[in-house]
Structure formats: C-alpha cells, structure tokens
C-alpha cells in the first residue's frame, strides 16, 4: 500500500501504549511527523514517548482527534472506538499499524523477522550485530532492547531491522 504523508500531518495513534504502536510512533516522530496518541492507561512505553514530548491522551475520546489528520489503529482497537468512529465521520485516512509499518519499510532495505517463537530475541541479536558495524539501521522490535532502553530507534542508514507480527497479518504489509 502506498501511503502519501506530508510532514504537516498530525498522526494520531489509537493504542499508542502497545509495544508495536509506541515503536512506530517513535520512528515517525523521529522522521519529523507530528505524532500524538491515546491509550486506556499509562505504561513504560508511554513514559518513553512523553520524554520525547509526544502528546498522549488517557482514554479514548472523540475530542482527542480534533487536530489529527491521519489515524493509525492497533489491531486491538474495536470498530466502536470513539476515536475510530470520529475519524471515519471526518473522513480521515485510517491505517492499521501493519500498513504504516509497511510504509516505513518501503523507505529502506529490510531485514525482517517473522515467526511464532523467538522473533524478539532474533531481532535483538540482528540489531546488536548491526550496532557493531558502521551501518546504523532503523530498528522496530517487539520488546525493549537493553542497549537502547527502547523498542525502536530511527537509524541514519537506508537499512531497517523489523520484527513483524504474524498474529494480525501485519507481516503481509512489508516487502523484505
């Protein structure tokens, strides 16, 4: 899927506290996009985003998307979510997390890790190997890397190391 985004977009992540959504939000923020989001409770992922001055709303409310121009939803978000419904009424572009991840992946050469067991460990090992080289990849992992104290990091090279989820079919959105 081709996604055309301007840096002036305000991208709202519904379910931003999840490990995959928080990592994606962090990368897009690092790329220069205006990022905000909401979740039902605060956690360590949200704390890391707030340290980057990303606006986070507690709870899902229609008013949270008043300035948003794009919506990204987690697979955990139900179709009766008030932010989702308000975005549909405003005719905002709505993307699944996997679609937005596919967009990020389309901008780089990728090493992708997929499977039912060991994805986070394998992605972490590959990211660690890359860190010993002069290649500085973008990393989106399914867990917090001790070396980064985060699950994601925007790199400076044209490479990315991505953990993809098979449970929601998001791996089908990325062309390695």
For each predicted feature, which ranges?
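ATP-dependent carboxylate-amine ligase
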Residues: 1-45, 50-55, 67-71, 89-92
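Phosphate-binding loop of NTP-binding sites
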Residues: 4, 27-33, 50, 63-64, ...
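Short acidic-hydrophobic, aromatic-tinged amphipathic segments that line or gate anion-handling sites
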Residues: 56-59, 95
């Amino acid at each position: 899927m081709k996604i055309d985004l301007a840096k002036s977009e305000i991208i709202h992540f519904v379910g931003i506290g999840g490990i995959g959504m928080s990592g994606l939000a962090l990368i897009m923020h690092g790329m220069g996009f205006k990022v905000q989001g909401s979740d039902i409770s605060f956690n360590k992922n949200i704390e890391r985003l707030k340290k980057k001055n990303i606006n986070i709303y507690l709870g899902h409310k229609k008013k949270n998307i008043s300035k948003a121009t794009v919506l990204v939803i987690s697979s955990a978000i139900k179709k009766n979510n008030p932010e989702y419904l308000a975005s549909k009424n405003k005719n905002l572009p709505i993307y699944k997390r996997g679609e937005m991840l596919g967009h990020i992946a389309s901008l780089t050469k990728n090493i992708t890790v997929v499977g039912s067991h060991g994805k986070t460990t394998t992605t972490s090992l590959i990211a660690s190997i890359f860190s010993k080289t002069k290649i500085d990849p973008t990393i989106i992992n399914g867990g917090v890397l001790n070396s980064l104290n985060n699950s994601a990091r925007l790199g400076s090279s044209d490479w990315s190391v991505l953990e993809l989820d098979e449970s929601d079919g998001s791996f089908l959105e990325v062309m390695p």
